[in-house]
Amino acid sequence: MRIWLAVVLALPQLAGAQVPHAAIANARIRAALYLPDAQSGYYRGTRFDWSGVVASLEWKGHTYFGQWFARYDPKLHDAIAGPVEEFLTNDAGLGYDEAKPGERFVRIGVGAVLKPDEARYRRFSTYDIVDPGKWTVNRGPDWTEFVHELRDTAGYAYVYRKKLRLVDDTLVLEHRLKNTGRKTIASSVYEHDFFMLDGQPTGPDVVVRFAFEPRATSALNGLAETRGKDFVYLKELEPRQTVQTEIEGFGASPRDYDIRVENRKTGAGVRQSGDRPISKIVFWSIRTTVCPEAYIDLRIEPGKESSWRIAYQFYQVKSGANAKLKKSRAYYD
């Protein structure tokens, strides 16, 4: 355990400087986390929530997250790892449509940013941060809690809590978002998992299993296809190849928020489940990562609070392709 932690804690320094970090572990899972920091954090872009960035995670010799990209820059929109989240309102930041050039709008989990004179929101760009808010990090041996407070920004303000905890074979992400401003917070939020099961390339050994029969809305160009409830790859993706589509077929029940990603070559599996209905799924993958992006919707009136939970249960793939997996108790605790 001590040897492993020493290796994990050295990982953030690979970015070239001292990066704030932490480690959590239980008897089965070991994970390294990057911590939010406006001056020296590993990720300082404005697309994704800064909390809960998982630098690496190991379960019974299998690895699940890591650096999937070739070029690192702390302000790149996607220079990030692990199951991270993005909040969107009308496919933009909160308050973006109301703000005039030179005024502020909100990126939840990032802070208040400046709106330039532009025709439309540039999701993959990095905006100037004018108020990063206040971050507090609380820690235990098998959990870390992030608290982000943002004061009034054009009528929007919040206290956002996100706790990562390990229970048995499961990483649980618990969220609470309290609206402390004058305006309603209406947003969607999705998990961008950046799965890297055992660092293997995306190809026929990888299968993504849904709780429903998925329908791809875009052409998969001979690279992948749906078979029943499975999304499968027909060939190993080359470095410049991408599979991207929206997925339809889910219903209005949280039961459909149940997605498994498996590598049949190495035996690594992960089951992602949520306690809210899915509102949208975007599927994106390249050679180095597989990302089924499940969205949920939030609407929080002033003075009110909303909570939601995502669980990642890690398991060994059995020989039977449809072997049953009992949902971890961590999902219900």
Feature locations, PLM:
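Sec-dependent N-terminal signal peptides
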Residues: 3-12
